[in-house]
Amino acid sequence: MTATRNVKGLLGTKLGMTQVWDENNKLIPVTVVQADSNVITQLRNAEVDGYVAVQIGYGQIDPRKVTKPLAGHFEKAGVTPRRHVVELRTADAAEYELGQELSVELFAAGQKIDVIGTTKGKGFAGVMKRHGFHGVGASHGAHKNHRKPGSIGGASTPSRVFKGMKMAGRMGAVRHTTLNLTVHAVDAEKSLLLIKGAVPGARGQVVFVRTAVKGA
């Protein structure tokens, strides 16, 4: 499917959270994302690939650790090898150039964005932590049932457990997109984005910041 709208995007590293004062003397919690060394490594076009997109590389890596096919790919783009690569479908892909560097100035303060990342892994979790179940009563004869899920299906009807039943299991460590966050400030000198609120992932996690797909 061909992209019909212009989308900007950058890969960056989540440095953590802090708080800053705004112009109304309100304390705003922000997430700091460092998005330096983004570069265009490939251009997709409708004639050859069937769709238009740009491929963005991010993060330094020892050239000795790069496979020969990837080394040739980066050499063709005229850039040093990058650790992370992501593809962004955008209608204005033809306006980019191979090897072009992208900066945080793609975004502006007040702009709505989406942030994609991998959530923190929580390990094996019960239904109360994983799905917000209330559990069983704390007294009145409840015996070692306080954090159990309760019934997961009748014996004769439906005599099975439905697919998708919320149960205990591995929690977190999944790809997650947070929509319609706001850019609080842009520090071009330090390649920093200050984003209002929280974004998925732990400190040091690589995240993808793009213009909001749903506007808001």
Curated annotation (Swiss-Prot):
Gene Ontology BP, a term: translation
Record region (Disordered): 137-158
InterPro entries, per database record: Ribosomal_uL3, Ribosomal_uL3_bac/org-type, Ribosomal_uL3_CS, Transl_B-barrel_sf
Keywords for the protein's UniProt record, in alphabetical order: Ribonucleoprotein, Ribosomal protein, RNA-binding, rRNA-binding
Domain of life according to the entry: Bacteria
Nucleotidyltransferase listed as a keyword: no
Gene Ontology annotations for the cellular component aspect, listed alphabetically: cytosolic large ribosomal subunit
Name assigned to this protein: Large ribosomal subunit protein uL3
Taxonomic source organism: Pseudarthrobacter chlorophenolicus (strain ATCC 700700 / DSM 12829 / CIP 107037 / JCM 12360 / KCTC 9906 / NCIMB 13794 / A6)
Organism lineage string: Bacteria, Bacillati, Actinomycetota, Actinomycetes, Micrococcales
Gene: rplC
